[in-house]
Design a protein with these regions (language model features):
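Sec-dependent signal peptide recognition
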Residues: 1-7
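N-terminal signal peptide c-region/cleavage motif recognized by signal peptidases
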Residues: 11-13
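Active-site neighborhoods and metal-handling regions in enzymes and metal-associated proteins
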Residues: 15-409
């Protein structure tokens, strides 16, 4: 297993694919405009028994996929620190780039590349004229450096970088669209394969196999395929249950392509036909989603409260249909309506305010009624445009008639 993973890592590109190489220094230049101190970011630590996935903020600023690197920035300087070559490790993981390689500047996109042994001396030099030290507050390696400058003010690197990541570039949007197209194909393949008696994990396998075939290297998150009683469990991902006729199945599955995610959910009947009650609940969720999407545009309010997209969806659900006791259905819509999508499937910032052109978000209302074993969620990934929005996953049908024509056929 270790040798196999080593071979895989040996052929993996050190630099992020799909984003123009000159976009990364442009991102750093934009960050430096608001940087009033020293920023230090550490690449994610290596794990030789798992697929290596770079820390998203580090990847966003550097495009660098390999472990062991460190980024240090001020308003005027940016330096990438790389570990030295380890000949023994290279037997397992392939040739790494050494900070002393002749072509290191071309390969990294940094004019200044130093060995990791120079971190402390460089840090002490940079903080002489810097009032703050910006790092990710959960990083123990950064804490060790900060201990060298106990009188300096601490800054939050995550907050600064989140502002940049909120708006997507054309290249980022293209990768999210690629992931979305592959995910649409995966959902359709699962619908065609759907039948009573199959297990949830079999449907999940059809979906992952399909989007891997479209050039996506991994799932953006653990696939959720929840049937019957599992359809009312929001983040159910065990996918172990046998699906039976007469049930609905919530399929919340999305691909990741060249590090960028998408997020898509559809709810379909296992036997290809909604019951009258399932159809009623489904149509209410679909109506709520359409109402919210119709209001997506720059300036639209996120979060909770009057006038927000969340309230639009809630009001629709709460004024259409009743539960078995005659009460409104709003209490069964128990989660947020939206989040950002990008390098992370839940991209920063965590707190969403007014929408801006260039944001990529989800719209995902749901109703979950445990006493009826009916859970319905409909989710699309959406680009906010200058005059409204574009549904990046809009090629995946969601009308009842379209679904019933495709499931199991």
């Amino acid at each position: 297993m270790r040798v196999l993973l080593g071979l895989l890592l040996a052929v993996a590109p050190a630099f992020s694919e799909g984003i123009p190489k000159d976009e990364f220094p442009a991102r750093r230049a934009e960050l430096r405009k608001s940087l009033d101190g020293v920023l230090v970011l550490f690449a994610k630590a290596d794990d030789d028994l798992r697929d290596y996935i770079q820390e998203p903020n580090f990847l966003y600023l550097t495009g660098w996929r390999e472990p062991g690197a460190v980024l240090m920035m001020t308003a005027n300087e940016e330096i990438l620190f790389l570990p030295p070559r380890n000949r023994t490790a290279e037997i397992f993981y392939g040739r790494s780039i050494d900070p002393n390689d002749a072509d290191v500047f071309e390969k990294t996109g940094f004019k200044a590349v130093l060995p990791k042994s120079a971190i402390e001396t460089t840090f002490l030099r940079l903080i002489e004229n810097a009032p703050k030290i910006y790092s990710e507050r959960t990083d123990s390696q950064a804490e060790k450096l900060e201990a060298l400058a106990p009188l300096h003010e601490e800054g939050n690197a995550t907050a600064l970088i989140s502002k940049l990541r909120e708006l997507k570039s054309p290249a980022e949007i293209a990768l999210i669209q690629k992931a979305s197209d592959a995910t649409v194909a995966a959902h359709l393949a699962a619908w065609h394969a759907m039948k009573s008696g199959e297990y949830e994990y079999q449907i999940a396998a059809v979906m992952t196999y399909t989007y891997f075939g479209f050039g996506c290297e991994r799932s953006a998150y653990a696939p959720i395929v929840g049937s019957g009683p599992n359809s009312v469990v929001l983040h159910y991902s065990a996918n172990k249950r046998r699906m039976d006729a007469g049930e609905v199945v919530v399929m919340d599955v999305g691909a990741e392509c060249s590090d960028y995610a998408t997020d898509v959910t559809r709810t379909v009947p296992v036997n290809g036909k909604f019951s009258a009650r399932q159809k009623e609940i489904y149509e209410i969720v679909l109506g709520a989603q359409k109402a919210a999407i119709a209001a997506v545009k720059p300036g639209a309010k996120m979060g909770r409260g009057a006038g927000t997209l969340q309230q639009i969806a809630f009001d629709y659900i709460n004024t259409h249909g009743k539960d078995l006791h005659g009460a409104p259905l709003g209490k069964y819509f128990v989660h947020g309506l939206s989040h950002n999508v990008g390098l992370d499937v839940h991209d920063p910032p965590a707190r969403m305010e007014d929408l801006k052109a260039g944001m990529v978000i989800t719209i995902e209302p749901g109703i979950y009624i445990p006493e009826e074993n009916i859970g319905v969620r409909i989710e699309d990934t959406i680009l906010v445009t200058a005059d409204g929005c574009k549904i990046l996953t809009g090629a995946l049908p969601k009308e009842v008639g379209e679904i019933e024509r495709l499931v199991g056929k």
